Amino acid sequence: LQQNLLKDREKAEQSLREYHAFYLRELVNAATGLVCNCSGKDNSYFRLYNYPWAVTFFLECWKLWGEKENLKTAVRITEKFYEQDGFRFYPIEMPIVMLCQELEKAGEQEDLKTVRDLFRRHADQLIEIGTAYPASEVNYEQSIVQPAAEVILQVYEVTGEEKYLRGAEQQIAVLELFDGQQPDYHLHETAIRHWDGYWFGKRRVFGDTFPHYWSAENGRTFKRYARLTGNEEYNIRGEHSLRGVLSMFFEDGTATCAYLYPYSVNGQKADFADPYANDQDWGLCMNLE
């Protein structure tokens, strides 16, 4: 979508149209909002993480082309997410504010009320859970805490209700614990993550990754908090967090999905950028917001 701002717009838009068609044909049931994990609408491996990304995609298509069906699809996907116990889930990149803003602009008041109520219920549930985080795909990690902070903080932005700001601040206090301020670009405001070189890398090595693209999620939350409260310290910290993942891109145009920071892991040499370029463009997306 960002490529549409460049000079070769026609070629980029054709590619985007083709991907939009692929998404609807292979992954998303636009009528029901179901988002499948694999092509062929194969949902044998159920994954709620896919839903927020699908909402974001169709929202961006709506913003670009002005085709109302994309906005409606984003709403149906949101509703389907919550039908499947999404209220207790910790989603990465749920575009709460953007969806509400776009529905408001489009005059879709009924849909706006529906999704606002869903988002409030979600935030209320996460506040009730507090710091007694349930296990997700792993038992505990930064990308469980950050979604809690981000969902609650976005609901505060949409509603202006003080209880959501207080709830988000409880989560941010925990989120900060994943970051250090060491004088090394690998470690300065870069949230610690552990499994990503194994799950997403070529060499499949467990070990602390500094950085991995999801590290920058902290930066998004810190900057949102700064904007809503006027706390400049968090704006600076957020900027450092976002810049930290830019080290995953190299001057020759190649990139890495994760940097395995320890010198060795279980006796195996580490301290390397994994050869795979795999999803690291999320880091660019977060810097472009």
Put a short name on every predicted segment:
Residues L1-E10, W53-E67, E83, E93-L112, ...:
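Well-ordered alpha-helical scaffold segments within catalytic/enzyme domains
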Residues L1-K63, K72-V75, E79:
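Substrate-binding groove/exosite segments of carbohydrate-active enzymes
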Residues D8-E26, W65-Q84, G107-G130, G160-F178, ...:
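Extended, well-ordered alpha-helical scaffold segments
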Residues Y23-N43, N70, R76-M94, R120-V145, ...:
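Glycine- and aromatic-rich loop/turn segments at beta-sheet edges
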Residues G40-Y49, A54, E60-W62, K68-V75, ...:
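C-terminal low-complexity, acidic/polar tails when present
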Residues R47-N50, I144, P211:
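Hydrophobic alpha-helical segments of membrane proteins, primarily the transmembrane helices
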Residues R121, Q125, A148-E289:
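Terminal, non-catalytic domain-edge segments
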